[in-house]
UniProtKB/Swiss-Prot annotation:
PROSITE patterns found in the cross-reference section: NUDIX, NUDIX_BOX
Key words, A-Z: Hydrolase
Species: Hydrogenovibrio crunogenus (strain DSM 25203 / XCL-2) (Thiomicrospira crunogena)
UniProt cross-references to InterPro entries, sorted A to Z: Nudix_hydrolase, NUDIX_hydrolase-like_dom_sf, NUDIX_hydrolase_CS, NUDIX_hydrolase_dom, RppH
Protein name: RNA pyrophosphohydrolase
Domain Nudix hydrolase: 6-149
EC top class, as a word: hydrolase
Cofactor(s) this protein requires: a divalent metal cation
One function term, GO molecular function aspect: pyrophosphatase activity
Function description: Accelerates the degradation of transcripts by removing pyrophosphate from the 5'-end of triphosphorylated RNA, leading to a more labile monophosphorylated state that can stimulate subsequent ribonuclease cleavage.
Short sequence motif named Nudix box, residue ranges: 38-59
Matching Gene3D superfamilies: Nucleoside Triphosphate Pyrophosphohydrolase (3.90.79.10)
Domain of life where this protein originates: Bacteria
Length: 165
């Protein structure tokens, strides 16, 4: 599903643990790390897409996390010219994303990268809050900075409510 401007609707998922560290996934067969993300299907809300992608890419259920916040508006990034598939119609020039900040309620053992035949990630780590901005592929750095800046204000919700169901 590509919009009229050539952007694919997508959700980005930032998972924070009790120590304030973020889930950081190593892409399969690549020397690249990123947050979980995925497309929003037709007739699917961004939040529904988050929980589907969370299960597909990280193996977590909605009960394993708490939604702490989301970006108010879509954030966009353009793909580098060499990654644009001009033979595909409609042509996708980038992604527009709603980002969600999720607090991890479960233990790390619940994380399972092998829920799909072809997993998105082959490894993962907990990293400091701002590490992803400098370490994601360059064309995503601005969107990561925008999302982390906007969602940082929601971090307090995780610790002030503690992990009470």
């Amino acid at each position: 599903m590509i919009d009229a401007d050539g952007y694919r609707p997508n959700v980005g998922i930032i998972i924070v643990n009790k120590e304030g560290k973020l889930f950081w996934g190593k892409r399969l067969y690549q020397d690249a790390w990123q947050f979980p993300q995925g497309g929003v299907r037709e007739n699917e809300t961004p939040q529904q897409a988050v929980f589907r992608e969370l299960k597909e890419e990280v193996g977590l259920e909605p009960s394993d996390v708490r939604v702490l916040g989301r970006t108010k508006d879509w954030l966009t990034y353009d793909l580098p010219k060499h990654l644009i598939r001009h033979y595909s119609q409609p042509v996708c020039i980038g992604q527009k994303q709603i980002w969600f900040l999720l607090g991890m309620l479960s233990d790390d053992e619940k994380i399972n990268l092998n829920t799909h035949e072809t997993p998105e990630f082959e490894g993962w780590s907990w990293v400091d809050y701002w590490v992803p901005v400098q370490n994601v592929v360059e064309f995503k750095q601005s969107v990561y900075h925008q999302a982390l800046t906007e969602l940082e204000t929601h971090l307090h919700k995780f610790w002030t409510k503690e992990h009470v169901g």
